[in-house]
């Protein structure tokens, strides 16, 4: 019957051009129409879809206007701004790593106006996907000049509350990591508590590391991610990567803050951060060696807060 055919087609899914790589077959099972409307561009690929979901996850964690640039499911650019100043968030997000922005996913949690579209055009930036809850008519006209760019208007930032993946001959499920650090989560453990400005940046940094592959370090200053290190097998290497990238793009780390998505097993990260001008640190805590990191922070007058929430991401 037509009903049986429809059910069978649903579970077989819609074929995608290919998977992560051209030699891998891929399908999407479900309805993308519930999440977004495609306004322009060619068919979405497997990589486009997983990166776009990652992008929505980042910007929807913020109440304030936020702009993120995603590459391989990692936030390589992220900034927040005041209401009506989303364009400033875009500029800061782009400046964090203009090289990695090439071929990335642009995501905003507010309407994209003409001013942002003009910037993207002037930068001659190639991007795979641009997604936002709304676009002005003029912005859309400008962005549509990019023939191959997929422009998506999201209907809802709500993502599935369960995450599913195959493992051996079975399936693993887990709850999505939806916790967002707030002021009530922060416990100052050093002699000097963070200033209001540092606290605001620490909360942004905590969101950033939540959306980076472990081991991850995020460096934030003035409401923007200025560098990050991710996917490293040691935490100190993630920090070294972040510092190197910040220096490469000309950022002054003096007054920046640092987030780690898991505890510091040794005080080496805090020591290196302080040596490079970082003034405040946020991490979950929970190491048997926490006190060594706290003592190191106190030695350098670095403020440290612990949250009790780890954000490993594999």
Give, region by region, the residue ranges found by the protein language model.
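Active-site loops and adjacent core secondary-structure elements that bind or stabilize anionic groups
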Residues: 1-176, 198-207, 214-216
